[in-house]
Amino acid sequence: LVNKVNAFQASYPEWPLPASICVYSNFAATVKEARKADFNITVVSACFPTSQSFLEVKLKEVEMAVEQGADEVDIVLALNAFLAGDTEAAAEEIRQVRRVIDEVAGKQGREVHLKVILETGLLRTPENIANASFLAMEAGADFIKTSTGKVDVNATPVAAYVMCECIAKYQAVTGKKIGFKPAGGISTAADALCYYSIVASVLGKDWLNKHMFRFGVSRVANSILSAVEQKTVSYF
């Protein structure tokens, strides 16, 4: 996959590179060594996809991933705590991850972004999704992400709309711009256009770039390429 991204613009010079390659934490160093193009290394970390382990284990995994070259760290909200009503425990875990990321990246003289996956399919209600969105942003997330792609219900337009509304409200109050990443269940160019339209209408043009808006699904890349090129493309 890294080699394909490295060579992508040789085949499609008019297209931008994918913003990032997403791998498990233990592959960060492998991707860093093989990387020859300008893309970020994203890791799913802290006991992805369930987030079920000791906090110390999660923090150590994040620490090692950043040490080995991760540019972005995706973690899953501690749903066991959040859904049980212990929102402070869920928030504190995000704060601790944020602290570790900043400490390790700071020693390396760089910034590493934190994305918090809400797993909206398990949160179920717009109220829960909104509460989780604000919790993650206030605890230090640079991005909020819908889903792991590992449960029955992943990204939905309703969840995306709620999350984008929360991002807009948070920005209005704090001045901070938080990114948005729908993930899971997005497989066609039409799906991608739906989420693009939500972001454009709720958040505006300042979010329509790779720094503020991502898709967390690899298969949609071929669908978008195929739609624009008007032929079947199976590059990725």
What are these regions (language model features)?
Residues L1-P16, N26-F180, S187-S218, S226-F236:
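Alpha/beta enzyme core
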